[in-house]
A protein has these predicted regions:
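Conserved binding/recognition cores within well-folded domains
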Residues: 1-90, 94
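DNA major-groove recognition helices of helix-turn-helix
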Residues: 56, 104-105
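C-terminal output/interaction extensions
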Residues: 105-115
């Protein structure tokens, strides 16, 4: 079963492996070209495992869906380009976002910067 115990730890299991990562080290998660797999991009590593984004999104309210193929950690956003519909992450990665997610992303980014 997949799951995130709390806002501090991203905790998930595959058939043969159990992995725990501090949530602040999760930059984003994207769907893999390999069916039924996702790729987690972390600050120190990248992992591919069997899962789907909908289950991960339900398990972790801290991660937000910016596009049907991406879940991002809003704490790791450094820039949002509304014209190109791109989010730049702390590791330099660029993630696309859909038009329907633009307002939610901007609001989340502004709220985070006010804290």
């Amino acid at each position: 079963p997949l799951g995130i115990e709390n806002d501090e730890i991203f905790d998930f299991q595959t058939q043969h492996t159990a992995i725990r990562i501090p949530l602040n080290q999760v930059i984003y998660i994207e769907t893999s070209p390999q069916k039924h797999y996702v790729i987690l991009h972390g600050t120190n590593n990248q992992m591919t495992f069997r899962a789907n984004l909908k289950d991960l999104e339900k398990a972790s309210p801290s991660l937000v869906s910016c596009h049907r193929s991406y879940l991002i950690n809003p704490n790791n956003i450094i820039r949002i380009n509304k014209l190109k519909r791109e989010v730049e992450m702390t590791d330099g990665s660029i993630c696309p976002f859909s038009r329907t997610k633009a307002k939610m992303l901007m609001d989340t980014f502004k709220r985070r910067n006010l804290q």
